């Protein structure tokens, strides 16, 4: 489909890629007309890897504040994100990870114009009020505490902290408690103004829609937003070569232990990554896997999981072995 204002990039596996010429926004269209529903998702190429000491957890806290109102969609007008989407019966959420933050809505295809307008507005018109930061900080801190009470999550966090001494994968997405509690609304605004721009984002639309109409709506609402006024900061820090094994011990209340082994592995875009994923399945996916037969079938473990973390930069290939009683 040729639409004025867009550059067609390529099609692969049923996915059509376009670039909005006005500002560099990447658009992925995946038509699927079996039901009158769509999924609209905006992914920002910013995650906890973009944080530094003092702002760890800022990406996640900002994700929470993205639901607290923008200039044209807020509770004072009776059309905040949650109010508007709830009235349409939409399912919606957001997630923050090491490499990215995404916001998505599953809703009827007749609501496409509404959701495009709403997401475009909060890309650059977020209110970001201190009165919203304080209660959301408490919510995020509670998430942090739940993670601290999870043996597996605590173990993963400590392994990443030991595996990465230079690269920002060193700290978890949730951040450190003191940063969560003390990061200012001004610092969050600075983070928002640095990374939340169309040339640092991808819009993905899946479902029942006409491509020309969808691109027209995206151009109408996103095309008025400029590119980032300054270059988006890039992470150039590379983790130095590890010179020996590293070990961590995490102690938590409980009866059973967990052994985890993490090997350095390549980034998700590396040509060897698919082979590592297949290796993980052979070793630990299901009751017929080799580690399951050697450990779980012999009552040495209660299960096993192995596989690589799919990340933008060189990652870790994990093997988790929850120990059986005795």
Please tell me what each predicted stretch does:
Residues 1-18, 117, 143, 161-201, ...:
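Histidine-acidic residue clusters that define the catalytic metal-binding segment
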Residues 137, 152, 185-221:
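Non-catalytic, conformational "gating/processing" segments within enzyme and secreted inhibitor domains
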Residues 1-4, 165-166, 173, 202-267:
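An aromatic/glycine/proline-enriched structural segment found at the starts
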Residues 30, 35-51, 57-61, 76-122, ...:
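M16 family metallopeptidases and their MPP-like homologs
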Residues 127-145, 210, 229-245, 296, ...:
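Acidic/histidine-enriched alpha-helical segments
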Residues 139-158, 237-256, 293-303:
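Short acidic/His-enriched helical or mixed secondary-structure segments at domain edges of catalytic enzymes
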Residues 56-70:
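Active-site SXXK
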């Amino acid at each position: 489909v040729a639409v004025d204002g867009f550059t067609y990039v390529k099609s692969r596996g049923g996915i059509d890629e376009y670039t909005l010429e006005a500002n560099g926004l990447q658009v992925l269209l995946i038509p699927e007309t079996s039901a009158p529903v769509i999924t609209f998702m905006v992914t920002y190429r910013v995650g906890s890897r973009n944080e530094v000491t003092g702002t760890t957890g800022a990406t996640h806290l900002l994700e929470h504040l993205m639901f607290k109102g923008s200039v044209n969609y807020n509770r004072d007008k009776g059309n905040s994100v949650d109010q508007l989407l709830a009235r349409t019966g939409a399912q919606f959420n957001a997630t923050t990870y090491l490499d990215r933050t995404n916001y998505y809505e599953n809703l009827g295809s007749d609501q496409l114009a509404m959701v495009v307008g709403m997401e475009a507005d909060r890309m650059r018109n977020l209110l970001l009020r201190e009165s919203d930061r304080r209660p959301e900080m408490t919510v995020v801190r509670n998430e942090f505490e739940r993670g601290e009470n999870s043996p597996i999550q605590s173990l993963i966090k400590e392994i990443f902290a030991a595996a990465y001494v230079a690269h920002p994968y060193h700290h978890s997405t949730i951040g450190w408690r003191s940063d969560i509690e003390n990061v200012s609304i001004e610092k969050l605004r600075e983070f928002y103004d640095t990374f939340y721009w169309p040339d640092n984002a991808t819009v993905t639309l899946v479902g029942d829609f006409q491509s020309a109409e969808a691109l027209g709506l995206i151009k109408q609402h996103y095309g008025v937003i400029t590119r980032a006024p300054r270059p988006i900061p890039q992470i150039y820090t590379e983790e130095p070569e590890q010179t020996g094994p590293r070990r961590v011990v995490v102690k938590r209340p409980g009866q059973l232990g967990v052994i985890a082994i993490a090997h350095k592995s390549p980034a998700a875009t590396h040509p060897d990554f698919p082979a590592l994923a297949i290796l993980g399945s052979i070793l630990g996916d299901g009751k017929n896997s080799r580690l399951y037969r050697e450990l779980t079938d012999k009552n040495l473990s209660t299960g096993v999981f192995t596989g690589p973390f799919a990340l933008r930069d060189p990652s870790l290939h994990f093997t988790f072995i929850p120990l059986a009683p005795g």
